[in-house]
Amino acid sequence: MKELAPGIVVFENVFPNSMEYITRIEEQGISWRPAEVLVNEEEYQSGTNTKARDTDLIMLPHHDSQEIGTLAELTKEFHNNLKPCLDQYMATYFAKIEKFENPQLLRYGKEQQFHDHIDDHPFFTRRISLTYYLNEDYEGGDVEFGRYGLRFRAKK
């Protein structure tokens, strides 16, 4: 675990065979859809807003799900590979996870982006957010924490 700033850490090579799942998803023709963002805070409505977030998404099942198939296998292996990292993070920062949201598999094409945003929100309180890169051979895609003046290129 490498700390980049208070509470912002990097783990590398946590899920070495992750690209096998991407290959299977592509071979099976599993559909990607446009990712959504909160578009009306007062009524808690989500929708597509490509000016804020322009990316493709596959929603994965929860790691406790009884579903079967490629996406369920990916979720379970993802969770099993990352759980030791989360445990180490929680022990280091005295953090606690009360529930896991379903993971999202995101795909960014050329010119796609997710602008500056905060993951914590009154409707969906997030104390720990996790980003995992399934590959490293891409252009752009730096992660930036503007409040810390921190920008880095993630590795899988």
Regions from the PLM with identified roles:
Residues 1-90:
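Non-heme Fe(II)/2-oxoglutarate
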Residues 68-156:
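Catalytic core of non-heme Fe(II) oxygenases with the double-stranded beta-helix
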